[in-house]
Amino acid sequence: MESLQKTSDAGQMFDVVVIGGGISGLSAAKLLAEHEVNVLVLEARERVGGRTYTVRNEHVDYVDVGGAYVGPTQNRILRLSKQLGLETYKVNVNERLVHYVKGKTYPFRGAFPPVWNPIAYLDYNNLWRTMDNMGKEIPADAPWEAPHAVEWDKMTMKDLIEKICWTKTARQFASLFVNINVTSEPHEVSALWFLWYVKQCGGTTRIFSITNGGQERKFVGGSGQVSERIMQLLGDRVKLRSPVTYVDQSSENITVETLNRELYECRYVISAIPPTLTAKIHFRPELPSERNQLIQRLPMGAVIKCMMYYKEAFWKKKDYCGCMIIEDEEAPISITLDDTKPDGSLPAIMGFILARKADRLAKVHKDIRKRKICELYAKVLGSQEALHPVHYEEKNWCQEQYSGGCYTAYFPPGIMTQYGRVIRQPVGRIYFAGTETATQWSGYMEGAVEAGERAAREVLNALGKLSAKDIWIQEPEAEDVPAVEITPSFWERNLPSVSGLLKIVGFSTSITALWFVMYRFRLLSRS
């Protein structure tokens, strides 16, 4: 691709200033520059990428310590990365996955661990079916308008799980499902928001799956290259170490000021940072009350991403692929994936320390976390080789002042219906991007691209360069990564829930008892 570079300095007039040099902000800037709009990106850190970050050193070659995964139906990030010359590779699932629960290891294949207890199976099946059916009622672009929005928004996911699930095993796995997908606790998040989140990621199976799901692939060379290559195209239109502290749109032109006292003038602003981080910026005039309230009410999830490197992929000797789903309160890690390079070099296991565990384990030394993780892997995989890594990398996203956490912001109960509708609403000449504002794969790189390009098209419309009907556009399917439709089986659709089974049994028992009484009465009458 040809360079989009254009000289820019403080004091120069720009058409658009983008706040935030993550994938969302940079995809917005790229689209604007392609339409010959004079754009400047102001990034607070010494690097671009935001919540994606590829670390490079002699021990790991490269490693994604932030957002990394892409898969079918994530067509915008796949199209953008292809334009930038990046390739993907599939995360290894050739061997068996592992489910560790109640101190035992159970190998399996597929998206979810199998359940052998028939009552528990009915409970699990009803859980996924109910969540997906509830999600179908929720508009992806306006969850606050769902028919049961107010009712579901008053509930936490803990409330909903307890309402749906009869068995302890299903309740525990459902809680883990929340931890893994949104790095927060079931009692912290709105049921409406979580059901919407799963729905806009394609449903319970798509969001949780590796094959044909959200974790199917990674980028050769790391996901950080997406932002780095856009930065190369934009050249000095991207300013690093420039945290924005002040936005004044009270005059004809907007004034943007950074922490190091640089001033920039522009016609429009795109904010492409997590909603809560806009509280670090002073606005003139003040933000509308709903927007001001919203940004104070969207906490970030908590996660420490951990990569353990080994001399060889010893887990493959046992026909394990490296993916572990771990149900154990004392275990630091809740889920792992193979993080070996696509050519088989640098064998590694990636694991997430999630939610409450991230808070707890952030308080101990890195060496203690490393030891606890190795001991866990040795126990789950049944191999002492897990105790002898050759290198360890980790990233605690809760320490990042310009992210505040990962993967995404979440909505506590009551916030979506009260304030959610303003999340994408412009404030004067300020427009909002960031993965939290997306309607498909929000929380992922795909959502970041959708939001950035949508905000850019909103500005292009304001500049008279684009029709309003072209702001929201459908993305064609990526030919290189086709999606296979996920269709529930006949039994998955029609098996009763545990409560349904009890009703059937109760009804059958009543009919049998009635028949028996009538039969006996007939015999007595004849005698």
From Swiss-Prot:
Cytoplasmic compartment ranges equal: 1-497
What is one cellular component GO term in this UniProt entry? Answer: mitochondrial outer membrane
Question: Which Gene Ontology biological process is one annotated for this entry?
Answer: catecholamine metabolic process
Enzyme class (EC, first level): oxidoreductase
* Residues the record lists as N-acetylmethionine modifications: M1
EC no.?
1.4.3.21, 1.4.3.4
- Entry-annotated residues carrying S-8alpha-FAD cysteine: C406
* GO-annotated molecular function: flavin adenine dinucleotide binding; monoamine oxidase activity; primary methylamine oxidase activity
What are the boundaries of the region Interaction with membrane phospholipid headgroups? Answer: 520-522
Q: Which cofactor does it need?
A: FAD
Similarity section? Belongs to the flavin monoamine oxidase family.
* Name the UniProt record assigns to this protein: Amine oxidase [flavin-containing] A
Organism name:
Bos taurus (Bovine)
Q: What's the gene? A: MAOA
